[in-house]
Amino acid sequence: MPVLAHSDCRPPFVLWNGHVQTVYPVLFRPVPTVSPARERIATADGDFLDLDWHQAVGRGPARLAVISHGLEGHARKKYVAGMARALTRRGWDVLAWNFRGCGGEPNRLLRCYHSGDTADLHAVLTHGLGRRSYADAVLVGFSIGGNQLLKYLGEDPERVPRAVRAAVAFSVPCDLAGSARVLARPANRFYMEYFLRSLRAKARLKNRLFGGILDLDGLDAMTTFDAFDDRFTAPLHGFAGAADYYRRASSLPHLEAIRVPTLLINALDDPFLSPSCFPAEAAAASRQLVLETPVSGGHVGFVERNRDNLYWSERRAAAFLAAAA
């Protein structure tokens, strides 16, 4: 499928910068008005997942959209709420789910979530489909939620329910090692520290809850994902180390196997992404994957001003899903 380099994403001139696009929505976007209903489901390994349900506006055929958030995010982040609002207006019931430990309460197990964990996404999707016998479903993911989504669709296409008609993923670090290297640069220290502050707090909490089982020596001195993932994320989730984790959890090797219409949107000025996160060759070889590369948009930014109070990402996702599903 084509690589769409001439995107119609045109942010306001004053926001024509990847860093500004990334930070502006976090600081200044009003929280979209949504009132989801929360549901808790059990996982097969004795843990739980918290789901937020948003009901479609108006009457029509029952259709389900599942939204996956980004690293250390949650289902009520502004970008999730904005997407949920856009899709419910188009007649989709929306299920926005929280990764383990991201719903406001620690999960029960020592393990948490990771960037390539597709089992929980599959569990959420199958639960959602069964709740109302939805005939049609679509997937939307942001950042590592997008990586999970793409990996899920491609690693075992036979496992994906037939009801899944299309998918959209934004700002995806589909090569996790490349993204980790980019974020380790001095220019991105602000973002790295933002995430590590949250991850360190979770490591300390897990250590207290599980009787001091973790080695926290040097935790505060860790300044990169590589160091944190090598000590915590990788061993807690069955990987040999950070390098093994990044290799096995990345969606990049699975993109050509995707069998449903899928739109991957990565802005060229995204400060989180390496060149390897723009998989033009995989898109060209795929019959289903479209890669769109707006000149600007930052990381999960895509700010746009319009009378509907929607961001460009929300309009683009709604239009693609309507056409593909």
Region locations from a protein language model:
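Alpha/beta-hydrolase-fold enzymes
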Residues: 2, 130-134, 138-236
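N-terminal cap/lid segment of alpha/beta-hydrolase-fold proteins
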Residues: 18-58, 303-305
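Short beta-strand element of the alpha/beta-hydrolase
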Residues: 62-70
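Conserved alpha/beta-hydrolase
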Residues: 76, 84-108
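Catalytic nucleophile-loop/oxyanion-hole region of alpha/beta-hydrolase
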Residues: 86, 102-138
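Short beta-strand/loop motif that positions the catalytic acidic residue
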Residues: 258, 264-266
